Amino acid sequence: MLERYEGRRLLAAPPWPFFTPEQTRLSRPAWELPPIAGQGCSGQASSHASIPAVVHQPWLHGGALKWEHILGMLSVRYVLRPKRYKLYYDKAPAPSPTWRCACLIAHCVQHSAPTRVPGNTGKRLKMYHWPDVMRLQLLLKHGGVFVDHDAFVIRSLDDLLRCPEAPVMAGFEQVSASATDRKLNPGVMLAAPNATMLRLLLASWGRNYSTEWDWNCCSRSYAVHAAHPGLAQVRADLGPLPRFRTKQDYHDHLKRTRVVHATAISHRWRRQELRASGLLRAVRDIVLTAANTSMGEAEWELKACAARVGAYVDHTF
């Protein structure tokens, strides 16, 4: 089983369960997290400047948002609680309840998408890479936080923003016990404006552009990080949701992580996993409790959005 994944990049979800006992033993230090003791800066003050509590989220190509995306947006607004929250679109989706809710939760701003490879303007980016480059450009210019639309914030990030351990922090991903499978997953990324690591990451696209889905944004990004220690920190508590053996393992994960990043949430295998574990229902309860506690009486439209999300998760997950 281990030989099947050793040194290979996975192109599809592996059979359930993902980790064999041997893989679990070897990879545990990479993704298993200690309980979070509490909020606030630990030890001495950070030597790095604080990161702006501003969230930038692109929504490109004009597609329709799903209710799980709205749950993610509610988690950003009411659990992360940024000072500003912007949703950038290049082409407005058709009017729909989800688009209306999205623009109630965040400030929707039209913004052109990057279509050319950074540093190589003669080469066009694949459309699925537009958001990857755009997130780096927005964070480089403004600083702040990027949260992908399949990620759900379940615990405050205030201490990381106030006392960052590096100018850039992102998710850690390891899809097998092989060191070659390590990735910097930018599905959740915190960054100071003008961070050197962001410039290096953007430059790496121009030098080594690949049309593979995540080679530049994840695999190549980890190589850049490894070559420049101290400029970034990769963290398992900001990384993608691992695949666990039991339902209890998934719920124990909620006690250890800050974000549930359910990558590939539109794929059947992931939806089956979330349904079987009940994990998204647990996330829904955390997020809607925070949202309903914060919403005022006048915010009846937002309350209606939250109610629609709750009913959708009950029915679908």
Q: Which residue stretches match the model-derived regions?
A:
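Small-residue hinge/turn detector
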Residues: 132-144
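Glycosyltransferase-associated regions of secretory-pathway enzymes
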Residues: 1-131, 149-317
